[in-house]
Each structure stands twice: as structure tokens, then as C-alpha cells.
Amino acid sequence: LRTNDIYFHHMASAWKQFRPSVNTKSDKKTDIKKLIMPLTGIIRLYALKYGIDGFSTLERIMELYVGKFIDYNLLRDSIREWKDLNSLRLTHHATCINSGKEPDNIVDFHIFNSDVICYTEQAAEIINDLILKAGNDFYTEII
């Protein structure tokens, strides 16, 4: 697939509207899928840009690192945040099933301990940094 710079510019710009925030201190609940989506989307964008054929987000992250398209810190942070958020999502699904409810992605952080809240807030921060990096890499700030 051949793409041009304007495609990546527009796609990186489109991801800006999905900047995650975590409602851990309010009475609102958070859609955990909306926290994960920008991470997987930006990784897909970089994979497409550099011709990475990985099938999963983790595979793409690893191949981006092996190809020296991302540095070790981005590799480590992306994998950790992807793992933490998906672990939280699957834990929530299991809790729903055990309670006899249909699983969803809406998480109430009032029922979690401070560690879960902390790593979820950290994930949102890392994902926002990744969105900013994509904006810089694909020149969304200059137009």
C-alpha cells in the first residue's frame, strides 16, 4: 500500500479528537475502549507509514522498534499501557460476567484501588504524549 504524507497528516490530525482523559475523580464512568483506541490507532498509523505487517498491536510495536522507527522508551511505555488497559478491560468483563451482567467497556474507577487508578491515569498521559508525537511526526501542528 502506498500512501502520501497528506494522508498521514490527516489521520494524525483525526486522532487528536480522541485524546483520552480518565474520569477517576468524578462521578462519571470511563469507557476503557476509548482509552485503548487512540493507542492502537496511532501504532497502526506508524506501522502503515513504515510498511509494518504485524497483525496485532504488540507485534506492530515490536516491529517498529526492531526497524528503529521508535525508541526503547516508546516501546516500553506503549507495551505497558496497552497491557495495563487491556488487563483492566478484561478484568471488568470478568466482573460483569460473574455478576450476571453482559460485559461492557464502561469502568467505574470508584471500585478500584489506587494502583489501578494511578496506572490508568499514567496510560492516558502516555497516550496523549503519543498523539502529540504523531502530530509532530506528521506535521499536524504547522497547518
Where are these regions (language model features)?
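Conserved nucleotidyltransferase catalytic core and NTase-mimicking acidic/glycine-rich helix/loop elements
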Residues: L1-I143
